[in-house]
C-alpha cells in the first residue's frame, strides 16, 4: 500500500512510520505546517507543530530513507480549529481543539489530499487500535493497549470513511517499549518529551489568548440565589467546574469553595455554587458522529467526556434524524461542560470499542 505517515516530530509518529516501512508499505512522510507565524509556536513549546518538530520529523524520515514533505494547512487550521476554538469559548462552551484538529485537519484534510494523490491510507502515532471483524464488515476502533496513553477518545470524532483509511501501528504497544524501539532504531526523538500544550497557545495562557481575540464582553458573576458578586470581562474567562481565578472577595455563606456551575453567554452571566451543584445525571449532545450507520435508537454503553477521564455506564437514546442523543448516566459526573465531546464505548474484553461521539449541548442534574 501507498501510505502517508503523518509526522508530528515526536517519538510515536516516528515508530509508527518505521513500522509501516518494516511492513513493506510504500511510505511518504509529511509534516503539517499549521501556522505561518514563526512567533506563534515557540521552540520550547511541548506542542506538536513547531519548526523544531518539523526538523525532527525530517531527521526521522532521512533515517528511514523515505521522502519527506511539509504541507501548509495553516489557512484551514485557522478556520476549522483556531476560529472554532475562539467562537466556542465566546458562547460559553469548553471545546477540545485537539479533537477538532483530528476531525478537520489530521484526518479529513490530510486524507482528502492523500487520496487525491493516490495514497491508500494515513499512518499516525495515535495509541488506538483497529480490528477487523470475522465477517469482513466495518472495522472496529478500540482503545490502545497502553491505558495510560490511550487516545481513542480524541479519535471518537472520526467517521467510518476516515477509519477505513487509517493505520495506528503503535496502538498495541506500551509507551516505554515505543521509546526503546525508537532508541534501537537510532531516532534522535527517542527521549523527546510528550506534547501537552495547545500548539497555537504555546505559553499556556488560554485566557490571555481568548481575551486578545474576543475582547471585553463584561457580565456578572452571581451565586445560586442570583446575588451579584462581581463584574467580569467576558464568559470566555470561565469554564464549568472552574475554582481558581474567580477573584470573589466575599466568601460563601457556608465558607466552602465556589465553582463555576453555569455560563449564560447571551446575558453574560456566570453562576457559581458548591461542588455538589456540578453533579449531572443526564447529558444531551448533538453534532453526532458514529462509526457504524446502524447506530440509532437505544442501547446501554459507556461514556467518556474528557481525554484522560474515566468512563461511566449510561443508557443512550440516539436520534440520528434529529442529530441528537440523550445519555442517562448510571452515576453522576462532575463538571461536564457544553462543547466537550461525549464519546461512547462498548465494553469488550479485547479492548473497548468506540461507537461514536456527540458534542455536549446541555446537562441535567
UniProtKB/Swiss-Prot annotation:
Keyword presence, Calcium: no
Residues the entry annotates as binding ATP: 6-13, 32, 125
Pfam family, one: tRNA_Me_trans
SUPFAM superfamilies on file: Adenine nucleotide alpha hydrolases-like
Domain of life: Bacteria
Interaction with tRNA: region residues: 149-151
GO molecular function, one term: tRNA-uridine 2-sulfurtransferase activity
Active-site annotation: 101, 199
EC number per UniProt: 2.8.1.13
Annotated S-S bridges: 101-199
Protein name as it appears in the record: tRNA-specific 2-thiouridylase MnmA
Source lineage: Bacteria, Bacillati, Actinomycetota, Actinomycetes, Mycobacteriales
Amino acid at each position: 500500500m501507498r501510505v502517508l505517515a503523518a509526522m508530528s516530530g515526536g517519538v510515536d509518529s516516528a515508530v509508527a512510520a518505521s513500522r509501516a516501512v518494516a511492513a513493506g508499505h510504500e511510505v511518504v512522510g509529511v509534516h503539517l505546517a499549521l501556522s505561518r507565524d514563526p512567533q506563534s509556536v515557540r521552540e520550547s513549546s511541548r506542542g506538536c507543530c513547531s519548526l523544531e518538530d518539523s526538523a525532527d520529523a525530517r531527521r526521522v524520515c532521512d533515517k528511514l530513507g523515505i521522502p519527506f514533505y511539509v504541507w501548509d494547512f495553516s489557512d484551514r487550521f485557522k478556520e476549522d480549529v483556531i476560529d472554532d476554538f475562539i467562537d466556542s469559548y465566546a458562547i460559553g462552551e469548553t471545546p477540545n481543539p485537539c479533537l477538532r484538529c483530528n476531525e478537520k485537519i489530521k484526518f479529513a484534510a490530510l486524507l482528502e489530499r492523500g487520496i487525491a494523490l493516490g495514497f491508500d491510507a494515513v499512518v499516525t502515532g495515535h495509541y488506538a487500535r483497529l480490528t477487523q471483524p470475522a465477517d469482513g464488515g466495518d472495522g472496529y476502533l478500540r482503545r490502545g493497549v497502553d491505558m495510560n496513553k490511550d487516545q481513542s477518545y480524541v479519535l471518537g470524532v472520526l467517521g467510518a470513511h476516515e477509519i477505513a483509511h487509517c493505520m495506528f501501528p503503535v496502538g498495541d504497544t506500551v509507551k516505554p517499549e515505543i521509546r526503546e524501539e525508537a532508541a534501537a532504531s537510532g531516532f534522535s526523538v527517542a527521549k523527546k518529551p510528550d506534547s501537552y500544550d495547545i500548539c497555537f497557545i504555546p505559553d499556556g495562557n488560554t485566557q490571555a489568548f481568548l481575551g486578545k481575540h474576543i475582547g471585553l464582553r463584561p457580565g456578572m458573576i452571581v451565586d445560586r440565589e442570583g446575588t451579584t458578586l462581581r463584574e467580569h470581562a467576558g464568559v470566555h474567562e470561565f469554564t464549568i467546574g472552574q475554582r481558581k481565578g474567580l477573584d470573589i472577595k466575599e466568601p460563601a455563606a457556608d465558607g466552602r469553595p465556589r465553582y463555576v456551575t453555569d455560563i449564560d453567554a447571551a446575558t453574560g452571566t456566570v453562576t457559581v455554587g458548591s461542588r455538589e451543584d456540578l453533579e449531572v445525571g443526564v447529558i444531551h449532545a448533538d453534532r453526532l458522529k458514529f462509526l457504524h450507520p446502524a447506530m440509532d435508537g437505544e442501547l446501554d454503553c459507556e461514556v467518556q467526556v474528557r481525554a484522560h477521564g474515566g468512563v461511566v455506564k449510561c443508557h443512550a437514546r440516539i436520534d440520528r434524524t434529529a442529530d441528537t442523543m440523550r445519555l442517562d448516566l448510571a452515576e453522576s459526573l462532575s463538571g461536564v461542560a457544553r462543547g466537550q465531546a461525549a464519546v461512547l464505548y462498548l465494553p469488550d474484553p479485547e479492548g473497548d470499542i468506540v461507537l461514536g461521539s456527540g458534542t455536549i449541548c446541555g446537562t441535567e442534574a
